[in-house]
């Protein structure tokens, strides 16, 4: 049986904290060193000095009405450049994420419990092309207080398969030792806590980088959708039209009187002045919106659960998904 998440700790990255989202220790790997930065290939979010496999940053999320989007775009024009991975006059691409969790959904519940330190295990692709040369990213995203620390490993889609995480000894060698370390750490944590596929999340992302900043990102997410899964399969072109997905950016999902966009600001420790002015000018209110937690809440409602007393989520029974 996997160990309790209340009793496992981290010896790499942020300090160890006893809570529901704590990362398992690496005691079984004496002398192992924490992942270090390495070069990131162009596909996927990255820029300048932040082209690392380990990124530490701050994030702020906002739910905004669609009518604000053109106004914010206009404000941003002097400060940003389009994400080169985006297509069209408005730089957009599709992001698909496979979320891993324990049978009791502890990683999803860590958000509701407001755990000071928590983490997510996810496998991510960009676009809908199933070309075997396209990349798959294994991401460990940690949040300690307000700081986001993300490590990732890149593998070609043609080498990805259902045995990679359960049996990391079968994984191919990646382009750098640092990425190999990140992949092994991802698999170690997933297997220690018994995490397996639980949810697919897909959305269209409009993305920009700060034109003169070491690391600053602006994203607008729309058509945010999910579907439950128990499979390691990463969907591609066959579901590019969102036909088999359940919407999340609805009034119910966003808890707003309108269906809106998820607007996000990302920066290093020195937040650009133009970002702070944007928040002030448009009177934006920060929200702790988590796509995975919202998908979990909506799915429980879809299956007939009711809201728990004093909880923004729903009542839960083990292995519900």
Task: Indicate where each model-derived feature is located.
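Phosphate-end processing signature that detects enzymes handling 5′-triphosphorylated RNA
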Residues: 1-321
């Amino acid at each position: 049986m996997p160990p309790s998440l209340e009793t496992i700790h981290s010896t790499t990255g942020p300090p160890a904290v006893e809570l529901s989202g704590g990362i398992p220790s690496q005691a079984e790997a004496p002398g192992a060193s924490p992942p270090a930065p390495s070069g990131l290939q162009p596909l996927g979010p990255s820029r300048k000095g932040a082209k690392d496999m380990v990124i530490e940053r701050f994030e702020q999320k906002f739910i905004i009405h669609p009518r604000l989007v053109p106004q914010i775009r206009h404000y941003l024009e002097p400060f940003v450049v389009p994400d080169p991975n985006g297509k069209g006059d408005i730089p957009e691409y599709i992001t698909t994420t496979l979320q891993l969790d324990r049978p009791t959904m502890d990683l999803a519940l860590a958000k509701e419990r407001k755990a000071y330190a928590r983490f997510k295990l996810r496998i991510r692709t960009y676009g809908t092309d199933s070309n075997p040369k396209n990349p798959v990213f294994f991401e460990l995203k940690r949040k300690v207080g307000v700081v986001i620390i993300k490590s990732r490993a890149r593998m070609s889609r043609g080498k990805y398969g259902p045995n990679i995480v359960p049996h990391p000894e079968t994984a191919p060698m990646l382009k750098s030792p640092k990425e190999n370390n990140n992949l092994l750490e991802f698999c170690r944590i997933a297997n220690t806590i018994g995490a397996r596929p639980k949810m697919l999340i897909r959305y269209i992302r409009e993305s920009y980088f700060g034109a003169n900043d070491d690391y600053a990102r602006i994203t607008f997410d729309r058509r945010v959708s999910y579907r439950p899964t128990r499979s390691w399969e990463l969907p591609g072109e066959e579901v590019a039209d969102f036909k088999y997905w359940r919407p999340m950016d609805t009034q119910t999902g966003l808890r707003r009187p309108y269906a809106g966009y998820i607007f996000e600001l990302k920066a290093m420790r020195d937040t650009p002045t133009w970002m702070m002015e944007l928040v002030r000018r448009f009177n934006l209110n920060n929200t702790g919106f988590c796509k995975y937690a919202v998908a979990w809440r909506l799915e429980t409602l879809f299956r007939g659960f009711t809201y728990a007393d004093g909880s923004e989520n729903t009542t839960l029974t083990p292995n519900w998904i």
